[in-house]
Structure formats: structure tokens, C-alpha cells
Curated annotation (Swiss-Prot):
It comes from Shewanella woodyi (strain ATCC 51908 / MS32). Could be involved in insertion of integral membrane proteins into the membrane. One of its GO terms (cellular component) is plasma membrane. This is Putative membrane protein insertion efficiency factor. InterPro entries: Membr_insert_effic_factor_YidD.
Length: 85
């Protein structure tokens, strides 16, 4: 069964998909130095962690995407469950 998205998650992922479809193709070849790309990472992070934490993770990832960073494979961190002991 598919997990339902909150309206904020839907909005964020729709805006990112719009970027992927309408803006990214005009920027030339794949310029992201990471795998998965920053936009794909953002969608995965928002779907897994929710809109607030997912956007925070995506922003941190985008800030690392510059010529001085080596890039490479950088998957979305798994969701951890906090429990009080």
C-alpha cells in the first residue's frame, strides 16, 4: 500500500519534478556531481523523512554540490526511530 503524502510533501515534490522536467534539460548535460542527482535526492528525502526534514537534508546536499566537493555516491540517510528509555 502506498504511503499518502501531506499537502506540503506533494507541493515540494511537484515543484522539484517541475524543475526536473522544465528547467534541468536546458542546463545541459548532467552537472550534478552526486549520485543520485540532487533533485532526485530531494524527492527521496521528502518522501522518506517528511517535508521539513526532507527539505533540510536536500538543502544541505545542494550546498555540498560545488566544484570544490568531490561528489560521489550520497544516498538519503535511513529514517531512524527515536524511543525514550
Amino acid at each position: 500500500m502506498a504511503k499518502t503524502q501531506s499537502p506540503l510533501q506533494w507541493l515540494a515534490t511537484t515543484l522539484i519534478r517541475g524543475y526536473q522536467v522544465f528547467i534541468s534539460p536546458f542546463l545541459g548535460a548532467n552537472k550534478c556531481r552526486f549520485h543520485p542527482t540532487c533533485s532526485t535526492y530531494a524527492i527521496e528525502a521528502i518522501r522518506l523523512h517528511g517535508s521539513v526534514k526532507g527539505c533540510w537534508l536536500a538543502a544541505r546536499r545542494i550546498l555540498k554540490c560545488h566544484p570544490l566537493h568531490p561528489g560521489g555516491i550520497d544516498p538519503v540517510p535511513p529514517k531512524t526511530h527515536r524511543c525514550n528509555k
